[in-house]
C-alpha cells in the first residue's frame, strides 16, 4: 500500500504528517507553513481559494469565505443556533440539515464539502512532498464528537477523494505522539483545547500500549469562543461610544474577529494589546475608527466563565478513570488555545502539577495520526491502541426513557446485544429509536435515528423476542442489527440519521469535487503557461538588447516577430497559440545563442578550464596568464 498520511482537521487550523524512516514528519504546505488555516473561499471570478490565501481575503469577501466549518459538521440546524450568529457567512436550512450559503456561486455547500476542500489541499500538498498520489488517511476528531459528527468527518474524507482508514480521537493521537518512545508506564492527562472543541482524556501509556481510561469534553468550547468574548467587548464599547453595533455589518464583524484573534495571541506573551481598526464604519458625519487598549487582566475577566468551563471535564475524566490528581504523572497540553496563561494556570490549580510543554500543541495531533497511519500500513510495529466511546448509546423504551446499552468510556471496538419485545397484542413491527448521551429521558439526548423492523409474527404483547445488537467499530462509528428470534430472520439496519448526508449526496459531492479539482488544475496550468510566456517575452527583449549587433538582422527580425506574436496571444489568453509560440520562440533563442558562441572570440571555455585545449604553439602574448603558479625545474 502507498503512504498513509495523518491529518488533524482542526476548527481553525489543520495539519498533515507522515511516517518517514520510522519517524513522524510534519509536512509543510505549498506556501511553506506547517499548519494550514481551515478556510475556504470563492472569489468574484468564482475561483476557489483554500488555506492562508483564503484567510487573507476574508475581510473583503466575508459572505463567501467559510471558516470554523467543523462546528457545523454532522449537526442539525436546531443544534447550531448560537454558532450560526457568530460567522460572517449565511447559514441556511435544508430540511433539518445545515447548509452554508455562497452568494457568488449562487449555491449552498454542506459543512462536509468545505471540510473536504481543506482535506484535499492537505493531501495534495503531502502528495507533492512525497512524490506520490495520496489516497489513504487517518483523520482525527474531538474525543467528544458524537456518532453523526464522526460519520460526517468520514464523509468529508470521501468527498476529498480519500479512503479514511481510521477516525482517531485527538487526545489519543496526542498521547501516541507523546508516548511513542516511552518504555516505563505513565498515567497521563491530555488537555486538548482547540479552536472549536475541548477534550480531556486520561490514558495509561507505556511499552507500546496506549489505553484510554476515560474521556470527557465540551464540543461547544474552543478558541473561537475566546475570540468572541473580545469581539463582543469591542462591539459593546464602540456601540456605547458611537451608537452603532458593528456586529450587524458582516465586513466589520470579520475585521473585529481577526483583530480579536490577533489580540488573544498577543496576550499570551504580552500584558496588553493595542487594537486599532481605522475606518471600521462610516456615518453621515464621516468615517469612524476603533482604537482600544486591551490588557491581559481585562481579557481574562471577559473570558472567566469560559476558563471555568474547562474545569468540569477535567474533574469528570479523573472521576471516570477512578484516579486522583496525585496518580497522574504528566499533563500534556494540546491545541493552540492552551498557550493562554489563564488556561495553564487553571490546569495547574486543578491538578496541582505544571503542564508538560515538550510537545508542539499545533502539530502533536497530526503526528499521532501519522503514527496510527504507520501502524495500519505496517510501518510501525508493537503499538496497541485501546480507545473508548465518549458517550453512552442506547434506545428509547416505554415512557420516553433512554435505556443504555453501551455505557460511556467502554473500550472500542465493542458489541452488545439486548432483547426487547412488543408493547401491544398482535404487533407486527417495532420502531427502535437509537440515542447517544447521558441524560435519563430520551428527548434530552442526541437522536442518531430510528429504524423499523417489520414482519414480526402476530403474538400477544411481550411474547416476541427482538434481539438488538449495537456494534461500535474502531472509528467509534455505530451500526445496528436486529433479529427476530421467533422467525429466525436477521436484518441489518442502517441508522438513517447517523449522518446528515445520504449516500447519494456523498457520491454526488465526490463527483463534484473531482470535477472541480480538474477545473482547478486546468486553471493552474493556464496561469503557469501565461507566466512562462510573459517571462520569456521579457527575457527575449533583454537578451536582444544585451547582444546588440552580435545578432544578424534576419535572426533578430524572426525572434522579434515570434516575441510579438506571443505577447499578443498572452494578452488575448489564447492558450493553444501561447503553447505553440512559446516552444518556437525558445528554439529561435537557442539558435541565436549558438550563433553568438560560434563567432570569433566567443568560443565557450572547454570543460577542463581556460587552457585545457591550449596548443604548444605560443603566440607573442601567450605567456600572459592570469593565474598563480609555481614552476618546477629539474
Swiss-Prot record:
Pfam families: HSP70. Induction: By stress conditions e.g. heat shock. Residues 619-634 have a biased composition (Acidic residues). Residues 592-634 are annotated as: Disordered. Signal peptide: none annotated. Keywords: ATP-binding, Chaperone, Nucleotide-binding, Phosphoprotein, Stress response. GO terms for molecular function: ATP binding; ATP-dependent protein folding chaperone; unfolded protein binding. The modification Phosphothreonine is found at residue 197. Gene3D superfamilies: 1.20.1270.10, 3.30.420.40, Actin, Chain A, domain 4 (3.90.640.10), Substrate Binding Domain Of DNAk, Chain A, domain 1 (2.60.34.10). Belongs to the heat shock protein 70 family. Acts as a chaperone. This is Chaperone protein DnaK.
